[in-house]
Design a protein with these regions (language model features):
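Bulky hydrophobic/aromatic "packing anchor" residues in well-ordered structure
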Residues: 11, 54-57, 80, 155-156, ...
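Basic, Lys/Arg- and aromatic-enriched nucleic-acid-binding interface segment
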Residues: 26, 30-34, 45, 49-104, ...
């Protein structure tokens, strides 16, 4: 099949086939589709195809991996935050999640101007309830102030937006996963489960 002949229906059949034969976790399937969508976007810009059939593709429902998640233990947190493998952005994001319970997307979108009156002001989120204010813990204040610079508007510096929805968290989330794996943290310990480990 030539690339121009690939339709949205074929994309759907492909995703269904992966689910049936490999039964991947939802995140694994999502990342696979995002990678293919990126390839089609490249092909579209170079006029190899007339559209990207994977653009805003709705994933089929597969197995849920909620049971894989578990709160971070004190030892998990210590190993991660004291590791030489963890860069400054990973350290700051993890600290913010621990002290606030924020989602990774929210943390990646935080700007220095969103902090005033010792509060994080969150203006974007999945729901209206996501728009809220969260107290800035004194520990976080020291960490963020020490990382501040005049020419950087975001708290997490240098993140490159990616994925079909162009999120700053896309590549960063993958990096966090690779770091956890490198540290041999338990499989169920993921960034999202920091929301269940709030200090």
């Amino acid at each position: 099949v030539e690339i121009k002949e690939i339709t949205r229906r074929l994309c759907s059949d492909y995703a269904d086939s992966i689910l049936k034969n490999k039964d991947p976790a939802h995140g694994t399937l999502r990342n696979t589709i995002l990678d293919i969508s990126t390839l089609f976007s490249w092909a579209y810009r170079r006029e190899y195809t007339e559209s990207n059939p994977f653009y805003k593709f709705k994933l089929p429902v597969g197995r849920k991996n909620v049971q894989e998640r578990r709160p971070w233990s004190d030892e998990d947190i210590r190993r991660f935050l004291t590791s030489d493998f963890v860069n400054k952005n990973e350290f700051i994001a993890t600290a913010i999640a621990l002290y606030t319970g924020m989602r990774l997307d929210e943390i990646c979108m935080l700007k220095h101007k969103h902090i005033f009156e010792d509060l994080f002001h969150i203006f974007e989120g999945k729901t209206k309830a996501a728009r809220r204010v969260v107290p800035v813990h004194p520990v976080l204040k020291k960490i963020i102030v020490s990382n501040d610079s005049d020419n950087e508007e975001y708290i997490l510096k240098g993140l490159i937006s990616a994925g079909y929805d162009n999120k700053r968290s896309c590549n960063f989330q993958k990096r966090l996963g690779r770091t956890r794996k490198r540290l041999n943290l338990p499989k169920g310990v993921v960034f999202h489960s920091l929301r269940n480990t709030v200090i």
